[in-house]
């Protein structure tokens, strides 16, 4: 199955973590980049388009600034990123030029993808670069981004970029062999999981947390990234990037890492954008009856099923939909503001106009704007 799936891949996103990209001194490892460039050149020669999502700017800047530890404050991180980004791209240019490949730097913030027009512009730029045979190297714009516009980590960014460029595969190169049944660093009985059909809550709970001393993402963020892409019908593989030609071997179908199979029913591009790209502005808590109707029958969310409103949001905002236990199970675009929802919650749709003095529609969230997670 793995080989057959990979034969169909014509465009792939490769995410490279700081723990893979950096050497023992904390700076960018030129030998790794040379090996990566050779493998990307091989894939390009076979007709596969490659988009790289690369960490490493902060790590490169930290080395240049002589910082002993990973920067902790936002100004320190932004200063390190400002110094390190040019060094990172210079290292990519030097490595890839040896194989007659050109690279292009793309810096993104979450707002670039949350805004639909800027999303389309970014996609157009990337499509043009790929058509010209240029390898895009994408990173978060750490020098200017603030917390509310952050992707969170480059694992999440790589999942959103996969949707942005309509790639058929996401490859996450990390410093561990893949997803294990338990943390292999602490449990000698942990075994590698070669294939995952569905990302369950049990898998998410067992994924653990923190990243390395040079990166921000642990296995939990990689699992979350895989979950995002499989919901749009795209496969993902998490594998160790430091092995011998592992990128080429994975693309040839060798049994390395953990393969996440695409979901049977995939989200369309718009619903994927709603579910994973827009940052939620608030939450709506529904009762058990509404949860069942939404989950099992794919209906719209009516005001009668709403128990509580959390946060302040305007009409047209993305909101989380929580069950009575506070567990998020859906996201959607609301047709009413938080103040309006607060007034009409628990009431029938026929009462909306009498309460508010106007009526946008019967639904607080229409089913076309609602995504089950």
UniProtKB/Swiss-Prot annotation:
It catalyses: L-glutamate + ATP = L-glutamyl 5-phosphate + ADP. Pathway: Amino-acid biosynthesis; L-proline biosynthesis; L-glutamate 5-semialdehyde from L-glutamate: step 1/2. It holds the Pfam family AA_kinase. InterPro entries: AceGlu_kinase-like_sf (IPR036393), Asp/Glu/Uridylate_kinase (IPR001048), G5K_ProB (IPR041739), Glu/AcGlu_kinase (IPR001057), Glu_5kinase (IPR011529), Glu_5kinase/COase_Synthase (IPR005715), Glutamate_5-kinase_CS (IPR019797), PUA (IPR002478). One of its GO terms (biological process) is L-proline biosynthetic process. Its main location: cytoplasm. Substrate binds at residues 55, 142, 154. GO terms for molecular function: ATP binding; glutamate 5-kinase activity; RNA binding. CDD domains: AAK_G5K_ProB, PUA_G5K. Residues 281-359 form the PUA domain. Keywords: Amino-acid biosynthesis, ATP-binding, Cytoplasm, Kinase, Nucleotide-binding, Proline biosynthesis, Transferase. PROSITE patterns: GLUTAMATE_5_KINASE, PUA. One of its GO terms (cellular component) is cytosol. The keyword Signal does not apply. It comes from the Bacteria. The keyword Amino-acid biosynthesis applies. It is an enzyme of class 2 (transferase). It is found in: Cytoplasm. ATP binds at residues 15, 174-175, 216-222. Disulfide bonds: none annotated. Belongs to the glutamate 5-kinase family. Catalyzes the transfer of a phosphate group to glutamate to form L-glutamate 5-phosphate. This is Glutamate 5-kinase. It comes from Citrifermentans bemidjiense (strain ATCC BAA-1014 / DSM 16622 / JCM 12645 / Bem) (Geobacter bemidjiensis). The gene is proB.
